[in-house]
Amino acid sequence: MTTLTLVLTAVGSVLLLLFLVMKARMHAFLALMVVSMGAGLFSGMPLDKIAATMEKGMGGTLGFLAVVVALGAMFGKILHETGAVDQIAVKMLKSFGHSRAHYAIGLAGLVCALPLFFEVAIVLLISVAFSMARHTGTNLVKLVIPLFAGVAAAAAFLVPGPAPMLLASQMNADFGWMILIGLCAAIPGMIIAGPLWGNFISRYVELHIPDDISEPHLGEGKMPSFGFSLSLILLPLVLVGLKTIAARFVPEGSTAYEWFEFIGHPFTAILVACLVAIYGLAMRQGMPKDKVMEICGHALQPAGIILLVIGAGGVFKQVLVDSGVGPALGEALTGMGLPIAITCFVLAAAVRIIQGSATVACLTAVGLVMPVIEQLNYSGAQMAALSICIAGGSIVVSHVNDAGFWLFGKFTGATEAETLKTWTMMETILGTVGAIVGMIAFQLLS
């Protein structure tokens, strides 16, 4: 099948999905499944491969996310009901002031997300944003956009995030320069796409705290201290961070290395934190065991719907990936004769927009530009700058084929149209600012 046909099929699928969800008001899960199957048929995918691809997309997306979102939902709900999240929110508001709350939550997202996957950081911190919104009476948009921007900036640009680590290794970039240029991209990107954009778009889009988030239930005990509350939030971050540090100093394959790998896996880290929150906080406050289990059960109800829609988004992404549209589009764009830094950004952005996966966009862009770059003998510093250009392109224009789009919408209660105005624009601004920093760095280093 020709490149043009594949691209038209992908674009048509996205437009049809937007129509079904936003105009026809079809449930997002059903619409995603219908369009995924249609995209497989029209892209020329063998009939016996379509169902297998859909299963692969669902399993690949939920294999990690299901456990993270479920445990994270219970953990966050326990912290909320015991007043721990309120303590953190109140302390942050006292330290930064109500007028700078959006900068505080953005910075928290940027720092806390360093050792974590994007989704893990969001499920751990979203309850803090809800609590801050309740205390300040602020439009939720003004707080969740900076939070998501901070987490997204760390995930896209900062080592040891999975994406920048992958890019640095694939591009043979200098890790020191990768850290420096990544910081120069992440910090202004977070500020512009987070607090500044969130403040602006909050005039036009209003989101409210979800209905299931009410005043904390404190049982018969006292409000936990700020120090203990913060330590609970930081516990999974520390466990994951220990794994990252151990990978540098402990011999791979040793017993100690395997233990650090086990303890620092997000599943283990969040499970441990969840158990500490239940037995070390809720029950010590005097909360009955039945009440604690009821809270955990209630936390899983909205999580189930969130996971189904995200999984369906993964199905759509996988169908587009397996159709071959990414490499076909990339090869067409490579021959356009653009400057190499711009080419890196445009390639990653094009694949991202068509397929939805930031990781696939990064890998596709690297695979297409490396044969050209290797002949030019760029330094490790220049390769780091080009890596940041690719990272920026890989996160722009997040829409209905990206799991992050549905994660934002379902956690915040935003409609699809509101998610496009808030989340999609935030990601686009963040990626563009980061890529511009990468392009400037490449020019200065040339």
From Swiss-Prot:
BP GO terms, sorted: D-gluconate metabolic process; gluconate transmembrane transport
Compartment(s): Cell inner membrane
GO molecular function: carbohydrate:monoatomic cation symporter activity; gluconate transmembrane transporter activity
UniProt xrefs under Pfam families: GntP_permease
Coiled-coil regions, chain positions: none
Bilayer topology: Multi-pass membrane protein
Keywords: Cell inner membrane, Cell membrane, Gluconate utilization, Membrane, Sugar transport, Transmembrane, Transmembrane helix, Transport
GO cellular component assignments: plasma membrane
Chief site of localization: membrane
Topology feature Cytoplasmic, residues: 1, 48-58, 131-142, 198-225, 283-294, 352, 409-424
Periplasmic side: 23-26, 80-109, 164-176, 247-261, 316-330, 374-387, 446
Membrane-spanning residues: 2-22, 27-47, 59-79, 110-130, 143-163, 177-197, 226-246, 262-282, 295-315, 331-351, 353-373, 388-408, 425-445
Function: Part of the gluconate utilization system Gnt-I; low-affinity intake of gluconate.
Family from the record: Belongs to the GntP permease family.
Protein name as annotated: Low-affinity gluconate transporter
Organism: Escherichia coli (strain K12)
Name of the gene: gntU
